[in-house]
Amino acid sequence: MSRMAFDRQKIVEAVKEAKARAKPRNFTQSVEVAVNLKDIDLKRPENRFKLEVVLPHGRGKDVKIAVIADGAVAEAARRLGLDVISSAELEEIAKSPRQARKLAKKYDFFIAEAPLMPKIGRYLGRYLGPRNKMPVVVPPTMTNIEPIVEKLKKTVRIQLKDNPVVHAPVGTEKMSDEQLAENIEAVLNAIIGKLERGENQIRSVYVKTTMGPAVRVEG
């Protein structure tokens, strides 16, 4: 695909059509992008990737963040009104696979103090890892985690693993077409940066709402 395939106006048009074709629901639908790749051998580990992309206009909705910590980091989290999981609570959660799964599903991101990471890996790794939700690690002496929290509120995590397609939430239907298009561009640029032959390995790009049909970004 040529650079013109990602012309901003073409993305805006696809977003506009995806929103128009979405039936009204009694909730605010998310807007997602799907990027189909080609000529990539996913049996080779070096071709797989995980990415964190900061969306210029944020996700358009609240992001649930939990902090696994004691001491200074826990206090910093409480000042920001975040949910805190202490090391003692972590031990209790470890005894119940059901609780661990529920925890992994409930939150979008986790922040954890470094000394607890061995326990987190042992107790929660099997639940957080496959969901691409392993914690952002901070030192136990950190007293201000607000910059990290603010960044996470605008961040999406995406990964290329077994199938040659990358999915990413890019906002909600209440955001403007231009804001969503800029967020999509940020995701596309991040993916292109990880591909050996860049945009030439992108087969197609689709935009859709949660319950609506997929609309192709025309090249």
UniProtKB/Swiss-Prot annotation:
<dbReference type="GO" id="GO:0019843">
    <property type="term" value="F:rRNA binding"/>
</dbReference>
<dbReference type="InterPro" id="IPR023674">
    <property type="entry name" value="Ribosomal_uL1-like"/>
</dbReference>
<keyword id="KW-0689">Ribosomal protein</keyword>
<dbReference type="GO" id="GO:0003735">
    <property type="term" value="F:structural constituent of ribosome"/>
</dbReference>
<keyword id="KW-0810">Translation regulation</keyword>
<comment type="function">
    <text>Protein L1 is also a translational repressor protein, it controls the translation of its operon by binding to its mRNA.</text>
</comment>
<keyword id="KW-0687">Ribonucleoprotein</keyword>
<dbReference type="InterPro" id="IPR023669">
    <property type="entry name" value="Ribosomal_uL1_arc"/>
</dbReference>
<comment type="function">
    <text>Binds directly to 23S rRNA. Probably involved in E site tRNA release.</text>
</comment>
<protein>
    <recommendedName>
        <fullName>Large ribosomal subunit protein uL1</fullName>
    </recommendedName>
</protein>
<comment type="similarity">
    <text>Belongs to the universal ribosomal protein uL1 family.</text>
</comment>
<keyword id="KW-0699">rRNA-binding</keyword>
<comment type="subunit">
    <text>Part of the 50S ribosomal subunit.</text>
</comment>
<dbReference type="Pfam" id="PF00687">
    <property type="entry name" value="Ribosomal_L1"/>
</dbReference>
<dbReference type="InterPro" id="IPR002143">
    <property type="entry name" value="Ribosomal_uL1"/>
</dbReference>
<dbReference type="InterPro" id="IPR028364">
    <property type="entry name" value="Ribosomal_uL1/biogenesis"/>
</dbReference>
<dbReference type="InterPro" id="IPR016095">
    <property type="entry name" value="Ribosomal_uL1_3-a/b-sand"/>
</dbReference>
<keyword id="KW-0678">Repressor</keyword>
<dbReference type="InterPro" id="IPR023673">
    <property type="entry name" value="Ribosomal_uL1_CS"/>
</dbReference>
<keyword id="KW-0820">tRNA-binding</keyword>
<dbReference type="GO" id="GO:0006412">
    <property type="term" value="P:translation"/>
</dbReference>
<dbReference type="GO" id="GO:0006417">
    <property type="term" value="P:regulation of translation"/>
</dbReference>
<dbReference type="GO" id="GO:0000049">
    <property type="term" value="F:tRNA binding"/>
</dbReference>
<dbReference type="GO" id="GO:0015934">
    <property type="term" value="C:large ribosomal subunit"/>
</dbReference>
<keyword id="KW-0694">RNA-binding</keyword>
